[in-house]
A protein has these predicted regions:
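"…together with the soluble PPM/PP2C metallo-phosphatase catalytic core" -> "…together
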Residues: 1-231
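Juxtamembrane interface at the ends
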Residues: 231-238
Length: 238
């Protein structure tokens, strides 16, 4: 592992503190919220910058200063979902627009995979949209969302492919910003981003390894507790 790949985590940490010093979004307490005071939000932008920097470094190293469509489409999807999340943080987008945007972004993200069967594409879109929304639902509960992302990325990275482990360092750097005291929330920009990342990693992960069938099952196992807890909470709440 090249030492340069630590840079994205440092960039995430720095951008996180820049967002704290110069806030672009504020989360105001609500009846359903877990916080009582205004908290700086949209921390997902720091994570996005870290992911982009990692992708650039990895792309330049792997492809000798060139990028494949995979990287371009993947980053585009992450950027779009983060932007949608940011506007939802600051302007409260309508449910129909959010849902439509999530479906479009999910379909775009699937262009980075080898899925071609219409039924599987539909199932994958449902998984991605659902994962985005449960991440959004569970965000803000004692760093639960970012902690699960760290666990998922680190575990899948150690088991299957190292790129995911590098993502865990980016997530960890954001976690450390809020370690002793919450300074900045992920916001919808961050929860949407993490949801898309996790879902696409589950769907596309098997193609990166010789353990194709076992990989898909294993990736789901890594997220089982989070999926079950979030689903149960949603059912119990409504």
């Amino acid at each position: 592992m090249d030492i340069l790949y630590i840079v994205p985590a440092l960039i995430t940490y720095i951008v996180g503190y820049i967002l704290i010093k110069y806030p672009i979004s504020i989360s105001v307490p609500t009846e359903r919220g877990m916080h009582k005071n205004n908290i700086i939000s949209s921390g997902g932008i720091a994570i996005l910058v870290g992911i982009i920097s990692f992708t650039v470094l990895a792309g330049l190293d792997k492809y000798s200063s060139s990028f494949h469509n995979y990287e371009i489409i993947y980053i585009s999807a992450l950027m779009l979902v983060t932007i949608i999340g940011y506007f939802d943080d600051t302007r409260s987008l309508s449910k129909k627009f959010r849902f439509g945007a999530q479906i479009f972004i999910s379909y775009l993200a699937l262009q980075t995979t080898s899925i071609s069967d219409p039924f599987l594409i539909l199932a994958a879109i449902i998984l991605i949209v659902y994962t985005i929304n449960i991440y959004n639902f569970m965000d803000g509960i004692d760093q639960l969302a970012i902690s699960q992302a760290i666990f998922f990325a680190a575990s899948s990275g150690l088991i299957f492919w190292w790129e995911n482990f590098m993502f865990s360092l980016i997530f960890l750097s954001f976690f450390l910003i809020n370690y002793k005291k919450t300074k900045i929330f992920l916001g919808n920009s961050g929860s949407y981003l993490l949801g898309l990342y996790v879902a696409v990693a589950i769907i596309s992960g098997p193609r990166e390894t010789i353990y194709e069938e076992g990989a898909l099952i294993s990736m789901f196992i890594l997220m089982t507790i989070f999926y079950v807890e979030a689903t149960y909470t949603i059912i119990a709440r409504f």
